[in-house]
């Protein structure tokens, strides 16, 4: 097998994401004509420690959200350096871009520019070798299909309603296969829609395809999801579990958590107890960003209280960054990391974060962003690293469904070699 193939062209363009904001798409062409194409996602609630997403700031165009600077960085600075390099050496490609940027947070070239190139190179390499992307990244051991973490009620920054917590999700950990898990979630989604309608609630959807009703409280969102699970013919806590993403950094003010929709302001200890009560009352298997990104003491309290029973995922806390993750591991906070490619900006650094997490006994959940495209890289990535969990929205809106459909194709390709771990994906908690 050939182990060297030159990059002959690197080209970027500005396209639109699912929130009608510009983003970067990159094409990488190889000497034999093979091409790899990748598009970059974007978040609404972003961690303060994420790599920099370069925006133009010209208010007269796309409200300042244009990405022509990032596109130009790809077409000039990055292309000049990468043309002639071996596309099969992903580490060297990413290292070259990191050195070209020269900042701690990708502020010069932009994480959106660098990630587009990094992923397009990986896709071009996979295409050249005639391999699926998950096989190219993960090798022969890539075989685990993920449990979906499916956002079906949106609140917080993802919706215009009075629900404080950002995401209420279902996880079909009791399903026998990925395709069955997807079917179960789809049926619950339909049941939830009819349940909300029958109770007089709006069934408009948020950024990630989940419903965004004006519920009376955060707990009511859980109650109505439980009702929908039962209505669809499944057992909560056996077939399907609940997962939450409060996105607590968004409601953290002056050292306290402001649940404005419920008229409550809680200390970190009280916030931890709030989750404890919910986890005792309902089949909650995972809580993401239960505490704010800089509330390390609050995270410690929460982890000590329920870290043995509930998956505690660090998103804004860790931002797919090995330095932040190493601190969390040392302090003993959280037990899982959310993986978002654009938080760190290259495929290599993303894989390093996943490896560090797994060595420490932390699970990894591969995730989309609220601003997505039709790009399906994360579907391949989650199988490549055998993470066992994926978070990519409701089974609605084509930019979300694209990832699920790609996973169906991968499941079909893996056939008997594929493995759906279900509850075993939560190997570091007692369930």
UniProtKB/Swiss-Prot annotation:
Reactions mediated catalytically: (2R)-2-phosphoglycerate = phosphoenolpyruvate + H2O
Cofactor(s) demanded: Mg(2+)
Keyword field contains Metal-binding: yes
GO molecular function: magnesium ion binding; phosphopyruvate hydratase activity
Functional pathway: Carbohydrate degradation; glycolysis; pyruvate from D-glyceraldehyde 3-phosphate: step 4/5
PANTHER family tied to this protein: ENOLASE
Name of the protein described by the UniProt record: Enolase
Organism: Clostridium botulinum (strain Loch Maree / Type A3)
């Amino acid at each position: 097998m050939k182990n060297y193939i030159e990059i002959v062209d690197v080209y970027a363009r500005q396209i639109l994401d699912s929130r009608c904001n510009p983003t970067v798409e990159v094409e990488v062409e190889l000497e034999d004509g093979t091409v790899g194409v990748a598009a970059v996602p974007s978040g609404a609630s972003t961690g303060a420690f994420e790599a920099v997403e370069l925006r133009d700031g010209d208010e007269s165009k796309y409200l300042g959200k244009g990405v022509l600077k990032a596109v130009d960085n790809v077409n000039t600075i990055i292309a000049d350096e990468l043309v002639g390099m071996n596309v099969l050496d992903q580490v060297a490609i990413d290292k070259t871009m990191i050195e070209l940027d020269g900042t701690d947070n990708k502020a010069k070239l932009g994480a959106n520019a660098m990630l587009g190139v990094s992923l397009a190179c990986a896709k071009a390499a996979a295409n050249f070798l005639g391999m699926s992307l998950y096989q190219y990244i993960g090798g022969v051991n890539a075989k685990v299909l993920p449990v979906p973490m499916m956002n079906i009620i949106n609140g917080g920054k993802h919706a215009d309603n009075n629900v404080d917590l950002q995401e209420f999700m279902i996880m079909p950990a009791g399903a026998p296969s990925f395709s069955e898990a997807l079917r179960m979630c789809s049926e619950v989604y339909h049941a939830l829609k009819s349940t909300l309608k029958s109770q007089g609630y709006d069934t408009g959807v948020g950024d990630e395809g989940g419903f965004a009703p004006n519920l009376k409280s955060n707990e009511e969102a859980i109650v109505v999801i439980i009702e929908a699970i039962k209505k669809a013919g499944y057992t909560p806590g056996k077939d399907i579990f609940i997962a939450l993403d409060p996105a607590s950094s968004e409601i953290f003010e002056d050292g306290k958590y402001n649940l404005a929709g419920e008229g409550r302001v809680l200390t970190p200890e009280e916030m931890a107890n709030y989750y404890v009560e919910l986890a005792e009352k309902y089949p909650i298997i995972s809580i993401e960003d239960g505490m704010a990104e800089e509330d390390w003491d609050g995270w410690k309290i929460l982890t000590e209280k329920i870290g043995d029973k509930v998956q505690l995922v660090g998103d804004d806390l860790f931002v797919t960054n090995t330095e932040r993750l190493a601190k969390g591991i040392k302090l003993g906070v959280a037990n899982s990391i959310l993986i978002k490619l654009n938080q760190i900006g290259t495929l290599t650094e993303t894989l390093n974060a996943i490896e560090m997490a797994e060595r420490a006994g932390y699970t990894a959940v591969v995730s989309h962003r609220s601003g997505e495209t039709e790009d399906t890289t994360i579907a391949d990535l989650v199988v490549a690293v055998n993470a066992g969990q994926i978070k990519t929205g409701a089974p609605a809106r084509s930019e979300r469904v694209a990832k699920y459909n790609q996973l169906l194709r991968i499941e079909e390709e893996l056939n008997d070699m594929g493995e759906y771990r279900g509850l075993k994906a939560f190997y570091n908690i007692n369930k």
